[in-house]
Amino acid sequence: AEKLVNGLEDESRESRLAAIQAVGMVQSNLAVTKLIEILNNSDFQDERLAATMSLGFIGDNRAIPKLNDLLNDDEPNIRWDSAIALAKMGEKTSIPIIENLLDRQYLMTFPELDYKEIDKVIMTAIETSTLIVDSTFEPSLIELAKNDQSLTVRDLAIKALKRSYDRTI
């Protein structure tokens, strides 16, 4: 893992990006401080997004303040992934963004997302809503379970309601 952490300082952008992703996959706590530095200093959105995701995979509490800052980032994917990372750590600060991600109409305001990607985002948000059970999510989950255009999304929402909220639809 130490070699991977050293790769975070590689001169090659591709190598750096690969190292950022790899330290997340192996959940290297050694990388947390360096990943936060990347978030503070990198001008590259792909590096910042990968660092955000890696901090979520690692799940180290030292990242919570930075992830909370990222909830207001200019880049939507970074806001979204920081919310998911925080939810994995049980942080309720993620709730408003996760709630937005359960809303198909909200997601359709992002022209860069196609229907397949929107479904994927919603399904990730449904799964995330089961990590940090909160009544805020219930109305959105019920709406998805009853009325969403995707049967896969409906099914996942039904299962989440049953498993986490003891609700049968």
Task: Locate each region found by the language model.
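TPR/Sel1-like alpha-solenoid repeat signature
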Residues: 7, 23, 38-39, 51, ...
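Amphipathic alpha-helical scaffolding segments comprising HEAT/armadillo-like alpha-solenoid repeats
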Residues: 1-9, 28-41, 60-72, 91-111, ...
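TPR-adjacent "capping" and linker segments in tetratricopeptide-repeat scaffold/adaptor proteins
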Residues: 111-117
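A short, hydrophobic/aromatic-rich structural module that often spans a beta strand
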Residues: 82, 139-167
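Short inter-helical turns and helix N-cap capping residues of alpha-solenoid HEAT/ARM repeat scaffolds
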Residues: 11-12, 43-44, 74-75, 106, ...
